[in-house]
Amino acid sequence: MALLQISEPGQVSAIHQHKLAIGIDLGTTNSLVASVMSGQSKVLIHENNETILPSVVHCGKDNKLTVGCNAYHYAKTDPTNTIISVKRFMGMSYKEVSTFKNCPYQLLENGNNVLFHTATGDLSAVEISASILASLKQCAEKSLGGALFGAVITVPAYFNDAQRQATKDAATLAGLKTLRLLNEPTAAAVAYGLESGEEGVHAIYDLGGGTFDISILSFSKGVFKVLAISGDSTLGGDDFDALIVDDCIKQLGINKLTPTQMQKIKQFSRTAKETLSNHEFAKFNCIEKSYRITKKKFEILAKVLIKRTLLLTKRAIRDAQVDVEDIKDIIMVGGSTRMPLVRFMVSDLFNKPVLCSINPDEVVAKGAAIQANILAGNKSQGDVLLLDVLPLSLGLETMGGLVEKVIHRNTTIPIIRAQEFTTFKDGQTAMSVHVLQGERELVKDCRSLAKFDLQGIPPMVAGSARIQIEFQVDTDGLLSVSAVEQISGVKTNITIKPSYGLTDVQMEKMLKDSILFAKTDIQTRQLHETQVEANRTIQAIDLALKKDKHMLDVKMLNNILTARTILFNMAHSDDEKAIKTALENLENTCSKFVEMRMNNTVMKAMQGHNVDEF
């Protein structure tokens, strides 16, 4: 039954007041903020009359952080203190970012985190991103004329748990309430109003300044469901700029550059790339030398990167279990899709024209604003339901170093899934829970997310305890895990907040390896399972002999001990067939002993009772 809101005559219920909600596209190169006004999603304008805020932060000596266009002016004169493309550093470890080419910043290692050594002080990627978000928040509050209820912030669909958590942390630091983290391709689909069109399958090709995402979505009966996602959070417009940078350095025979010179070449290269979208050549002066590149040469260089995006696109189509012909629309998102070659090659893959009628820089922010307006309660969500998916499988370590998958890759989120486990040894009073991410069968081949212990399990016979472990992934793609011993009610839980995450090169490798080593992994898993069963049987026999050895005559005891020794010697070998043979031999040898113990237990239970009582 619906609840009615009752208020005094003349009073307006707060529940019906319009709440100020915004959508934020926190981009690698540029960031935007949008809001729904008079039923239309509009990108808000900053003080300089621009809708785009460059994702650039200058860290000055006076502890002042300058954001946007004003910060960008410092890039040539003070490159080590001017942080550009900070999104690439979100959720990354020091080891991972140390491989970035031509990085002008002084980076410090702080545990698993990375710090930028600047004139302002040592700052994390989260703190720098927070200053960008704070600037967007200030712009929104000024434009909308009031305090914000909250924001929907977009992230690449292929952002992992660490990168998503880092984004939420940055929002909190900026004083923003995160209503939801929304995948960028999903936001684009909302902006294009696909939910108001015919039912069908759509592809969202999102090539931004530093990230690439491809999402295959279906729309049916009011539900937007992400069928599959793929991408690379370290591939974007910056990499196309780098092609020109490298060609310039090679062509002009430059051996060494100062950080200031490198930053100038990067800016010139970006301008040259944009020029080549409409002209046959571009040129600029570099260290008193003239550099020239033709459109034809740039496209030859760029094809390699575009082909990488198309391989990921094909994989997403395969994962979605649809054919190219089934896809109705291909939406182009991100500033890098302005390159004519990108549009041509994507159109050629799908054999149909691509959609790019909405400004590719603004489409994500507009979609996020529409979703924020719904989540703020300003508009019914009855029109459309958004369902995203998980990029990698989540599971637990079991005996023998095996991984038991709890939630599989490309499962729709939010989701709660539980699985029951038990104890391995008699009298076991604690269990270590090891949460993993990946597609392989063994712990050593997957990524560790967290470990925690469930203490206070009542001591009982091995296999008697019932421990339910529950995985919960929220709408933001963040994971929490709980463990409950069903008999005693003992419970513990953890929210996974990793200090750094996987690069998409690592993600790609994990997925490729899961296919490449699928047969070997299954064989290895079967071997490990047999080894675990052998050790479990040996422990059970040892315990039985300790209690009831007196039941056996010398011959039976010697036969059991001989069979046990054979299995013990084979238990750690790589010969699964031999282990199974030895295991079967021990079980057959012990069958009479098992029967004797069972009869003895029954006789003890019946002492002093009649059969009729049972």
Curated annotation (Swiss-Prot):
The keyword Transmembrane does not apply. Keywords: ATP-binding, Chaperone, Nucleotide-binding. InterPro entries: ATPase_NBD, Heat_shock_70_CS, HscA_NBD, HSP70_C_sf, HSP70_peptide-bd_sf, Hsp_70_fam, ISC_FeS_clus_asmbl_HscA. CDD domains: ASKHA_NBD_HSP70_HscA. GO terms for molecular function: ATP binding; ATP hydrolysis activity; ATP-dependent protein folding chaperone; unfolded protein binding. The keyword ATP-binding applies. GO terms for biological process: iron-sulfur cluster assembly. PROSITE patterns: HSP70_1, HSP70_2. Belongs to the heat shock protein 70 family. Chaperone involved in the maturation of iron-sulfur cluster-containing proteins. Has a low intrinsic ATPase activity which is markedly stimulated by HscB. This is Chaperone protein HscA homolog. It comes from Ruthia magnifica subsp. Calyptogena magnifica.
